[in-house]
Each structure stands twice: as C-alpha cells, then as structure tokens.
Amino acid sequence: MTIRFADKADCAAITEIYNHAVLHTAAIWNDRTVDTDNRLAWYEARQLLGYPVLVSEENGVVTGYASFGDWRSFDGFRYTVEHSVYVHPAHQGKGLGRKLLSRLIDEARRCGKHVMVAGIESQNAASIRLHHSLGFTVTAQMPQVGVKFGRWLDLTFMQLQLDEHAAPDAC
C-alpha cells in the first residue's frame, strides 16, 4: 500500500468512494451522489489553493482518499483547515484511514497551518477513536444540526493544534 498525491485520473475512483459514503453512511451529509466531473472540479479547486488530495493505492487500485480545505472562507481562519478521509468499504479496518490522516496532518504542517478541524457524525465511534488516537480533542458537540436517512444527526467537532506558535504574527 502506498500513499501518494492524487492526479486527475484518480477522480473516478474518488467519485466511487465518495458516492458509497453518500448512499450508505452518515459521514457525508449529502443526499445525492455526484458524477466524476463534480469530483474533478473539487480536485482542481483544491489544486488551485495549493491543498493536497492524497490517495492510498494497492496494486494500482485507489483504496481511499484524503484532503483538507479552508475551514471557513474568512481571512481570520486562514491557518485553520477542515479535513476529509474516506476509505473504500472493501479496504476498511486495515489502518488506511490512520495512514491517510497521518500523512494529511504532515501536509497541513508543511503548508503552515495551525489547526486542523474534524466534523464527525457523533455516532461514528470509530472515527472519533481514530482522531483521539492521533491527538485530536473534542471541542464541541452540536445536537440535531443535520438530517439524513430520516433522522436528526449530531455533530462532534474535534481539532488538532499543528504547531506551537504563540501568536499569529509568529506564523
């Protein structure tokens, strides 16, 4: 298994993984699937901002992906990013999520980011455990802020401080 930077050719596999999460999980709070052009536009937008899109690959097959983007689009949040990590269902439980997220944390540090935020559906105990194990702490619990599959969803926010800068002008 290798982790590498994605390229445009990976967008079809990324779309498949994304759409599975849309249809079968509460990890993505969208109701409709997307086409490859949608994920290609998403990929290109990340590239324009200098943000990484990583894929895990085994025997030439994309098994997962990870990325981060602006947490909020205001200048004051320029050192804070929110990330996403998704693993193909046939490859879950093999530690790929941990490997992708660890590499993504390294990339955020390389990009000079200060905080990485995770927004996790509160019933996703595996994701919350993974984030705790990598140093993330719970910073907020937001009950019933989303809906999917005919039920209210709670949101857990977790964050990881990526550096030790005492003040923003030290960044």
Swiss-Prot record:
Catalysed transformations (reactions): L-methionine sulfoximine + acetyl-CoA = N-acetyl-L-methionine sulfoximine + CoA + H(+); L-methionine sulfone + acetyl-CoA = N-acetyl-L-methionine sulfone + CoA + H(+)
Enzyme class: transferase
Keyword Protein biosynthesis: no
PROSITE patterns associated with the record: GNAT (PS51186)
Keywords (A to Z) from UniProt: Acyltransferase, Transferase
MF annotations from Gene Ontology: acyltransferase activity, transferring groups other than amino-acyl groups
Protein's name in the database: L-methionine sulfoximine/L-methionine sulfone acetyltransferase
Protein source organism: Salmonella typhimurium (strain LT2 / SGSC1412 / ATCC 700720)
Name of the gene encoding the protein in the UniProt record: yncA
